[in-house]
Amino acid sequence: MIWYPYQQMKTMKEPYHIVDAQGVYLYTRKDKLIDSVSSWWSVIHGYKHPELNRAIQEQTERFAHVMLGGLTHEPVEKLSQKLEEWLPGDLDYCFFSDSGSVAVEVALKMALQYHLNRGSRRSKVLSLTHAYHGDTFKTMEVGDDPDYHGILREKRDVVHIPTQVEELERVFAEQGETFSCFIVEPLLQGAGGMRMYDVSFLRRARQLCDQYGVLLIFDEVATGFGRTGHR
């Protein structure tokens, strides 16, 4: 038996049985479906892309995976260098993880450790209403989904605010020196209802985070790879 994600086994609908995929399409034995969510945002370039398939095949003929615990290799070094060239400012270090939830967990841990290393015990996290950042425990806590995660709502070290500059300024004025980080899905909240907000909010968030020594985390699992515009 398979326990499918986000499903109650007694009430779930029969899943589509996929036998092939090409581009944006998924195929059952009799139907052709459009994958409008890119397999939860991960199949960015479509299925069976010839250049990607060729690169994967060439790499697996050498090795499919080598951990980075005390080891390194050319593909990860090349990717790190390319990301450093593309990313703005002084974003010069890359930490690799295996899922969106884990990437967010690592970012939150780094923020807490950063303040500990500076002699501060800041532990609060600022987040947005309607936020979604994953389904591990801490990412569920910083998300804003009472239907799924109500058991965690009694936690007091996460503050949620709407995407309004006035509320942003108010919460920083009142609690800014207690926040370790502010985590956002930039410009578009995906799983929270495809909610878009103005870039002026992000610009003000950057200013206030710098003013109060708060780290700003962009969760771009759903918005990266140019989905919100040109870099």
Q: Across the structure, where does each feature detected by a protein language model lie?
A:
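Glycine-rich loop-to-alpha-helix module at the N-terminal edge of alpha/beta enzyme cores
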Residues: 5, 32-118
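Short, acidic, Ser/Thr-enriched surface-loop or helix-capping motifs
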Residues: 27-29
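Catalytic PLP-binding core of fold-type I/II PLP enzymes
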Residues: 195-228
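Short, small-residue-enriched loops and turns at beta-alpha junctions
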Residues: 42-45, 189-195, 223-225
